[in-house]
């Protein structure tokens, strides 16, 4: 056999001394005698025979026969490389796909299937957080989950990275129990037989990065990306205490992102064993361990002194001490600056009739056809959780709504006693400052103003509200949104974005509406405003504005937009100039309406009209002055003749 092998591989220098080793191995007592391979030599000679696998094949290696005497002897002769692809059952390596046009990497938010589970075609395998949203990753064929290679919460997984292994038969799952990505890597030839696992395991070296090695089974909960632009967050409030039981869908903490304060929910049942980041801690980087969750209540005490290095330096930030007043008065404590241990509620109760519900509970309620107004929430501030939906028994009489808690905000602080107060800068306020500064410094703004006769719109609005009485209420701002969207279709240059290398002209009009909240300015989006009726727009605006003020907006509801409207007319502001919201090219500033004398074809020669002043801020890189004027002309035409919005 060796002569056949050596003859075919005679041009391979690394194998020159193998004949002597082959003979020596066969002399070892107890080693089975292996004769030359029977049968004719292979007819095909076009395969590569200069590599490890090629020489093994020429020497009679038979992968299908498993651990035969011949195979064991060849492994000792050639040096085993460890487990290789062809030594495993048939399987499929599942790579991370591109789930958005601009996606370069993703985060495994949650695995929907566990190792050993059967996967049917169309089943959701995992939820992957892209640069745009969290997207479900579905299976394209029937199979079984053999091995998960990328753990939940792993961030910045590049596209194409292998995230799991699937097999066609359930009996093949066991073969991948210890499979790792390194298992299929090209091995380094070994000069001796593979040692036993006990011999290869080196003693663990002390490392502060592995504090959980001597702890009971547990899960580190990392700070996730709760908005596409989030790089860090502030732990506003912990809704659970150490030792409390956690159920799927329970609100764990309130996290302040760069856009809003968002509830962070529990994905699975367990017990809160340790809080690693205290309330009020600011600028916590993404991926930082926030807390420890265990499956068994008895394991909680083991984590009393748990201290991972990632969070040892994270402490609640206290505002700089306020200098004492100049006047000679007895020094008094400064109660105005909120301490991290007792922050203001991140999410004040909403107006009468508002239902607080977790996303998971809301989804289950829709599936079961449950009216959320009839469900009594047992979560924080009356929040409805998954447990409430599961235990809900429908009744004919809906329970009385919970008492409305008066909203509290940053302004409702104790009476000042010094000459000034230092207010900590929130993440939202910091981002607003950065973006507005960037806009004014990098975008060449110019401004165009025009007066619009609102008489016809006011008449149409009055008639429509009579028709919709008890169903919806349309505002003047809803007509403005509709007219703006239609004007953007007429003058698409105003519905464009500066993208550094190109000007992107958008084919749909998503109108961002500026809303003032206690936390700062935010711009929820009325999507596809150009094809929606004013009633639908009115309902969208009311819903979005309410969610914005309560900090309940989801990232996709305020990220994006192609055109922005800012309305200060309700405050009596006659006119103002707004700052462009990049990468958009325009923003429309709406002033108050006031009665003015205008020329008219009547006996008096004049009439009294309700005139509204608007100012369009334009990016001169995208919209030239004449183009901006054309847009305002179209906008005024739609409002002064609202019937044309039906064309």
Swiss-Prot record:
N6-lipoyllysine: residues carrying this PTM: 132, 259
Primary localization: mitochondrion
Domain Lipoyl-binding span(s) in chain numbering: 91-167, 218-294
Stretches assigned to the Peripheral subunit-binding (PSBD) domain: 356-393
Biological process annotations from GO: glucose metabolic process; pyruvate catabolic process; pyruvate decarboxylation to acetyl-CoA; tricarboxylic acid cycle
Residue stretches of biased makeup (Pro residues): 317-346
GO molecular function, one term: identical protein binding
Post-translational modifications: Delipoylated at Lys-132 and Lys-259 by SIRT4, delipoylation decreases the PHD complex activity.
Keywords from the named record: Acetylation, Acyltransferase, Carbohydrate metabolism, Glucose metabolism, Lipoyl, Mitochondrion, Phosphoprotein, Repeat, Transferase, Transit peptide, Tricarboxylic acid cycle
Modified residues (Phosphoserine): 100
Transit peptide residue numbers: 1-86
Compositional bias ranges of the Low complexity kind: 197-211
Keyword flag Transport: no
Active-site positions on this chain: 620, 624
Assigned EC number: 2.3.1.12
Region (Disordered): 29-49, 184-219, 312-346
Record: residues binding CoA: 461, 475, 566-567, 591
Entries under InterPro entries matching the protein: 2-oxoA_DH_lipoyl-BS, 2-oxoacid_DH_actylTfrase, Biotin_lipoyl, CAT-like_dom_sf, E2/Pdx1, E3-bd_dom_sf, LAT1, PSBD
Modified sites of kind N6-acetyllysine: 466
Pfam families: 2-oxoacid_dh (PF00198), Biotin_lipoyl (PF00364), E3_binding (PF02817)
GO cellular component, one term: mitochondrion
Family: Belongs to the 2-oxoacid dehydrogenase family.
Disease: Primary biliary cirrhosis is a chronic, progressive cholestatic liver disease characterized by the presence of antimitochondrial autoantibodies in patients' serum. It manifests with inflammatory obliteration of intra-hepatic bile duct, leading to liver cell damage and cirrhosis. Patients with primary biliary cirrhosis show autoantibodies against the E2 component of pyruvate dehydrogenase complex. Pyruvate dehydrogenase E2 deficiency: Pyruvate dehydrogenase (PDH) deficiency is a major cause of primary lactic acidosis and neurological dysfunction in infancy and early childhood. In this form of PDH deficiency episodic dystonia is the major neurological manifestation, with other more common features of pyruvate dehydrogenase deficiency, such as hypotonia and ataxia, being less prominent.
Function: As part of the pyruvate dehydrogenase complex, catalyzes the transfers of an acetyl group to a lipoic acid moiety. The pyruvate dehydrogenase complex, catalyzes the overall conversion of pyruvate to acetyl-CoA and CO(2), and thereby links cytoplasmic glycolysis and the mitochondrial tricarboxylic acid (TCA) cycle.
Name recorded for this polypeptide: Dihydrolipoyllysine-residue acetyltransferase component of pyruvate dehydrogenase complex, mitochondrial
Species this chain originates from: Homo sapiens
Taxonomic placement: Eukaryota, Metazoa, Chordata, Craniata, Vertebrata
Gene: DLAT
